[in-house]
Regions:
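Surface-exposed acidic/polar loop and edge beta-strand patches at domain peripheries
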Residues: 1-154, 158-166
Length: 166
């Protein structure tokens, strides 16, 4: 197997493209929200056929949902009236949390003959206390290998004196 990782800027987004060159599988991840915006296979005619809603389209739609496979958190729906209290700390935010609106750091890319991965990271330095008041980091890894595509979420508690934050 042969894998490649390339980067591109498109419509104001920084994208990472991870491709299985031999089996014709490709994922594209936007660093904005660490969002998977394309998962596609190449067909016999040499065209990429996507599996996601609005696959590989980063333009704003005329109406409707603008995302593809959103990473949501640390809360998943809405905060009533845009705010809530968590452990005595106020949280303010919109729908589906703040993670999808943040630019994540590419913490590493890895390719070899058996697979390839992209690891993204967001830390407490990347968000405001009003967005989430506790110190938690998230690593998100997308991987392609012989078994397919996988996604791994890893949470790191930077306040070990406190019990679970999520």
């Amino acid at each position: 197997m042969k894998f490649s990782h390339t980067e591109e800027d498109r419509d104001g987004r920084h994208l990472d493209v991870l491709t299985d060159e031999e089996d014709g599988l490709r994922i594209i991840v936007s660093r904005l929200g660490a969002e998977l915006i394309s998962m596609a296979r190449i067909n016999e005619a040499g065209n990429w056929i996507g599996f996601l809603y609005r696959d590989n389209d980063v333009t704003a739609p005329a109406k409707g949902w603008a995302n593809h496979a959103t990473v949501m958190g640390y809360y998943l729906h809405r905060l009533k009236n845009g705010s809530s209290l968590y452990r005595g700390h106020e949280i303010k935010g919109g729908t589906h949390g703040f993670l999808r609106a943040k630019t994540w750091h590419l913490a590493g890319s890895f390719t070899n003959e058996s697979g390839a991965s992209l690891k993204y990271r967001i830390t407490p330095d990347d968000f405001l206390l009003i967005e989430y008041p506790l110190k938690v980091s998230v690593d998100l890894t997308y991987r392609i290998d012989v078994t397919g595509v996988s996604v791994l979420f890893e949470f790191r508690n930077h306040e070990p004196e406190l019990t679970a934050h999520l």
